[in-house]
Amino acid sequence: HIIRNKIVYLLHLSFILILSGALTTHIWGIQGNIHLRQGETPVTTFNKNDGQKADLPFSVSLKQFQLTYYQGTFAPMDFISILNVYDGPQMHEGSVSMNHIYTYRNYRFYQSTYDADKKGSTLSIAYDPYGIALTYTGYAFLLLSFILFFFDKHSYFRKLLNHPALKKITVCILLSTSVITMFGASVPPSLPKETANEFGKLYVYYNDRICPLQTLAKEFTTKLYGKSNYKGLTPEQVLTGWLFFYEQWKQEPMILIKDKEVQKLLGAKGKYVRLADFAGSTGYKQEQISPSDMNAKTTRAIEEANEKFSLASMLCTGNLLKIYPYFDKNNAQPIWYSLTDDLPVSMPHEQWAFIRYSMNLIAEKVAHQAYNEVKILLDKTKKYQQKEARGFLPSDTRFGAEMLYNRMNFTRPLAMFSLTIGILSFFLYCWKMAKQRNSSKKQNSILLAMLGIVFIYLMILIGLRGFISGHLPMSNGYETMQLMSVCAILLTFLLYRKFEAAISFGYILCGLTLLVSMFGESNPSVTQLMPVLSSPLLSIHVVTIMLSYSLLAFVMLNGI
């Protein structure tokens, strides 16, 4: 009881410290911003958030501002301000970036924004030495009290953990899922699989990064059709089909439109429409709808349909395929062009002709079914890419890892498998509880072994995605749901000895989270992170939140 009371006192003390820190920050904390320019005299004042001026006990100037990019692209990776701080006779140098705070005499400098000419920087300033110290101390005590609570033998948590009611479940969950698969009567013309795969091995500038064309093909197919393959064709076959057999593919009902109003507007009989359905005798059909007839839902659905129409149109014109790098000595890195882009006048004529006509030559060979010659031309194109963008391309290992990831990433069947096994094992567990029979150790071992295989598969996917992107894969809903699936499996292995139903719950939670991630997979992209999102602390925060959600889900299922 004495130990438990100490834990309770520590818990209440943590709340007092946290609230005291917040009050201290509100009353005595100072926040504002300061604008600095390279080459200007040091600044001794800054603007507070209330509009008033405040003095600094030192002066600060901007020595240099740096804007760094992801390799081979123009996507910003970080904003860095290098400062000179003058305090009496002393001069200190410090740097501020999106994920690095510079602190001097309890003044904290944060990177906020920068000037268009990249010669100036705006920094946020915070001065709150006492509020921060009180708040952080309070959170440390709060965490310590929670940990001590679980180790207290007389706590209600330990009593509930061994309570017989924990092992009885009175309500069964009924979850029915259905998978509807559509196959057309005929397959549209396409390249042989081997030839299409050679296209997938080209480099392409897409989503502000350089990746295999296979990635673009998969995301193009998924964006239009909702799945990564169409009528048994690979994503590369779909993409090259649209590129070289446009007249036939525009008649294919493969563009997914979910909204009934948009389906009616396009004259479609189902949820899949043709590209040809977007245009009528009087022009583009979606421009004919009156704004007064559009609500927020319809407007959003029309925008999504327009996006798919534009994506298909960009591919068919070649504008989507930025596969031709050109390195100008006046630029720090190569610029990637499509065959329809305006090319710089400084480009040599031979290079200009290659970019303008190489794809036309490939199309001619495709028309004559000279696929061996197509492969030779694709090899020449890739050699041109490697020569012109040398030093700016992803490594062969990373390039191969991305192609492996594209071939391995099948979330839908894994989600359905996990849900099916989870529901069946849950019903079996309930039946054995009703019959007062013990579960078979062999059965549990098989279930755990299969769950272990799912865990390894997910970890490989997450590892590949992290290696490809160059950051921890926790930056969007798709990635965080994958992480939550892993957390659910880990909790299953930790809890199943004390709580047998955790095996079924682990499968169900894994399946449900993967099912949710499928919504993100309908528009997935491995992109460069905005600088503020690449913080290790933010990644730790996401892991903690996902783990807590997994625990909460176990508690919810246990309550049912």
Model-derived segments and spans:
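Solvent-exposed, non-transmembrane regions of integral membrane proteins
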Residues: H1-I560
